[in-house]
Amino acid sequence: ALSALAAATLALTGCGSSQTSSSSAASASGSSSSAASQASSGKVQVFAAASLNNAGADLEKAYEAANPGVDVTFVYEGSAKLVTQIDQGATPDMLITADTKNMDKAKKLDEFSGSDSTVLVTNKLVLVTAEGNPGKINSLDDLKTTDGVVAVCKEDVPCGTLAHEELKKHDITLKNATTEGKVTDVATKVSTGNADAGFIYTTDLAAAKKKGVNLGSVDLPDVEPNEYPAALSKTGASSDAAKKFNEWLKTSDEAKK
């Protein structure tokens, strides 16, 4: 749930109106409660930035437990790839990107044209090191001299945009870099020891530690937190199930736990 994000330095900014969506697919019998049952059932598909994978799983379970008949599915990928999939014809009910840049791109596409977006949470980039710190990387400046493998997201992915900006700001050229498509791939590389260091989010660091992987970390104080805007697609805007899920996401204490 969203409080798990806050615990890892994601903060709910909660304002405005963001909505989710889905195709309502439940059939009800002719009982007195059938109308209410139909209104609260259906499917909701959310395209979400890869760094939200742990929170999304918790949200799915919590909402479905409280709303039998509703099927919420989060699809995780790098934000840029999600926008590309939508451009190629995918029609999720809702999109949550890890930056405003990719959301702006999505809103230029027909499926999200005219959609309003709302920032749900923020996240923070951090430099992490593999267990035992084999690359002896204790500061950002150590990246200037290390021969260790450093994992970085592709530049068009939010985590990559932030990482490359930080490297450029400090005049750092990596000697031995590996480029990954999404932040969870970077986290996996470092967690498994296939990279000595990498740029991930504080949420990914928290998730690794929860799994018992003791990654080291180097704070990046001059990196601004990035925002996670959410928007409904045209498909989602017509879904009662999606709108109800969205309202729960914004207002429910359970969602914020």
Predicted regions and their residues:
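A short, gly/pro- and small-residue-rich
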Residues: 109-116
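Short, high-confidence coil segments that cap the C-terminus of an alpha-helix
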Residues: 69, 91-92, 195
